[in-house]
């Protein structure tokens, strides 16, 4: 028999009661503030910031025309758009205070938002396995290392894939 999933808003409300969730937030926020993954510093964030400074061209051709590294952002438009809002806010703050920190912070926050979205989707679909999902996904050393230490953006296509599967269900 088909089971209807609870709305994400209800899952979100219940999630805030979980101490494991709070522990994961503390760990991940500490890493967001303390770490600067090289791949983000040298490739991803400069690529996006370059487009803010000259948004006339497509991001990839504009970056190459400005002398950027061809390996800088090997992702498509959806990945670019996913990082755009929070990185733009950070870039605006950087320009206001004449620093170079908040664009990087904004980029990392976009990954954190997607991480929470993916957690919500998993909790929504696998309603009877909350504790396991919180331990094995939310506190997974592998996920934390790949996303927050190494700085990869692979959570975005994974979250989109899982979301599309929930729509099929």
Language model regions located:
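Juxtamembrane loop-transmembrane helix junctions in multi-pass integral membrane proteins
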Residues: 98-105, 148
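Mobile, glycine-rich extracellular loop/lid and propeptide segments
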Residues: 76-78, 82, 115-118
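Start-transfer (signal-anchor) and selected internal transmembrane alpha helices
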Residues: 1-35, 124-130
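Hydrophobic alpha-helical transmembrane segments
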Residues: 18-22, 81, 134-136
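Extracytosolic helix-loop segments that constitute the early lumenal/periplasmic catalytic or substrate-binding loops
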Residues: 43-74, 78, 88-95
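Multi-pass, polyprenyl lipid-linked donor-dependent membrane glycosyltransferases
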Residues: 109-113, 135-139, 143-162
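Transmembrane-helix motifs of polytopic, lipid-linked glycan transferases
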Residues: 18, 105-130
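Specific aromatic-rich, kink-prone transmembrane helix
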Residues: 120-124, 156-169
